[in-house]
Each structure stands twice: as C-alpha cells, then as structure tokens.
C-alpha cells in the first residue's frame, strides 16, 4: 500500500512538472527564442505602439502587447551570454528601459516627440547591429 502511494505521488509530481513546463513554453507575446527575430519583432511592435494615434480603438491592446514583449524580451535575453553582450542588446535594453519607465510613470499619456525620436534612433541602431550580427 505504501509503495503504491509513493509511486502515485511521484507520478502526480511528474505530471505537474510537465504541465507547468509546457504552459511556460508559450509566452503569448510572439517571441520565439531566436534573438535576431525576437529583436525585430519587438521593434516592430514598439514602433506601432509609439506611432499609434491617441484615439486609436486598439491603443490599450497594442500597449499591453508592447509591455508584455518588453518584459518577455528582457527576461529571456538579459542573462544569456550570447545575447547579453551584443551591442544590439544593450541598445535595445536602453530603449526598452526608457519606454517601460515612461509607461510606468505616465501610462496612457502621449509619448513626447523627443522620446519618440530617441526611440526610433535606437531601434534603427539595433536593427543595423542585428544585420551586422553584433
């Protein structure tokens, strides 16, 4: 009887680990784990978010997607040695920190032109670095 309980307990633990592992694989943000592709995906989403008119009906949805991608991108690549030291990553991290800080402080307010220009410049630099592989 004790042996059966022990085996069932182990089986249940294994099933829970597999279930949690499988649900953790899909972040829901559209990031794949391919650094170059994920960087370009995040840039495209963020460009859409910062260029969206204030009265756009899908503004909140786009901002939520942008926030999710920012969090997922940083959490995936901050500690990875192969991506963390790249120039494109440090440029992206600077841009993402600026935008995340703005969203945290000001929420739904329009992004100032000065910040938009700086973000666009950093996105362009990151894209060029990705193309060169750095």
UniProtKB/Swiss-Prot annotation:
Keyword list, A-Z: Lipoprotein, Membrane, Palmitate, Photosynthesis, Photosystem II, Signal, Thylakoid
Major localisation: membrane
Lipidation (N-palmitoyl cysteine): 25
A biological-process GO annotation: photosystem II repair
PROSITE patterns with a match to the protein in the record: PROKAR_LIPOPROTEIN
Subcellular location: Cellular thylakoid membrane
Lipidated residue numbers (S-diacylglycerol cysteine): 25
Pfam families attached to this UniProt entry: PSII_Pbs27
Topology within the bilayer: Lipid-anchor
Reported consequences of knocking out the gene: Not essential for photoautotrophic growth, under CaCl(2) limiting-conditions absolutely required. Impaired recovery after photoinhibition due to impaired assembly of the calcium-manganese-oxide cluster, especially at high light intensities. CP43 (psbC) is more susceptible to degradation, higher turnover of D1 (psbA). Calcium-manganese-oxide cluster assembly is improved in a double psbO-psb27 mutant. A double psbM-psb27 mutant is incapable of photoautotrophic growth, but does assemble the CP43-less assembly intermediate.
One of the record's GO cellular component terms: plasma membrane-derived thylakoid photosystem II
Keyword Lipoprotein: yes
Keyword Thylakoid belongs to the record: yes
Signal peptide bounds: 1-24
Subunit text: Monomer. Forms a complex with a monomeric, partially assembled PSII. This is probably the complex in which D1 is assembled and/or replaced. Present in 6-10% of PSII complexes; mostly in monomeric PSII. These PSII do not evolve oxygen, do not have an assembled calcium-manganese-oxide cluster.
Family stated for the protein in its record: Belongs to the Psb27 family.
Task of the protein: Plays a role in the repair and/or biogenesis of the calcium-manganese-oxide cluster on the lumenal face of the thylakoid membrane. Photosystem II (PSII) complexes containing this protein are monomeric, are assembly intermediates lacking the calcium-manganese-oxide cluster and miss some of the lumenal subunits. Probably blocks binding of some of the small lumenal subunits.
Protein name: Photosystem II lipoprotein Psb27
């Amino acid at each position: 009887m004790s042996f059966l309980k022990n085996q069932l307990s182990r089986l249940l633990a294994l099933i829970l680990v597999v279930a949690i592992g499988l649900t953790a694989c899909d972040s829901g943000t559209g990031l794949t784990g391919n650094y170059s592709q994920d960087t370009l995906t995040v840039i495209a989403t963020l460009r859409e978010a910062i260029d969206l008119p204030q009265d756009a009906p899908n503004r909140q949805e786009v901002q939520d997607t942008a926030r999710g991608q920012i969090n997922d991108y940083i959490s995936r690549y901050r500690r990875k040695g192969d991506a963390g030291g790249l120039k494109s990553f440090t440029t992206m991290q600077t841009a993402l920190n600026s935008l995340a800080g703005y969203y945290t402080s000001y929420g739904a307010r329009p992004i100032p032109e000065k910040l938009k220009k700086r973000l666009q410049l950093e996105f362009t630099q990151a894209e060029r670095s990705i193309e060169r592989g750095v």
